[in-house]
Amino acid sequence: MGFKVVRAAGVDTDLELINDHLFESYVDLGDPISEAVDRAAARVRSIETDMEALMHSPYQGTLSPQITPGLRHVTKDKAIFYFEVDNVRQIVLILAVFFSGQDHEQRILERLGRT
């Protein structure tokens, strides 16, 4: 049996924020609103596909033991995924998804209550 990807509570909000950011960026760059909506939604779907693909190679990415033991992060097409792997339960727990030029290390520290 393979690993299962599980989203922590804040991940859906992360994806909504990314969607909003992308939508605003596309509109600012001149896209019509309907096209900006479609492009942002497609990009978020792509991020979700990349997130689900972590089930196939759960031990990829960089360990971040300075933040918390077992924490990993990996960047895929400008989306940064923070996650933990539970080998016993065969779960990849997605803790956060950040996008592009954000200070993602500071943001994960805040998310985990370490600041």
Locations of regions flagged by a protein language model:
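Structured catalytic/translocation cores of nucleotide/phosphate-coupled proteins
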Residues: 34-37, 67, 115
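A short, surface-exposed loop/turn module that caps and links secondary-structure elements
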Residues: 48-75
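Enriched for short, Lys/Arg-rich terminal
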Residues: 71-80, 84-115
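Arg/Lys-rich, positively charged N-terminal/basic patches that mediate binding to nucleic acids
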Residues: 1-44
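GIY-YIG nuclease signature motif recognition
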Residues: 11, 47, 83
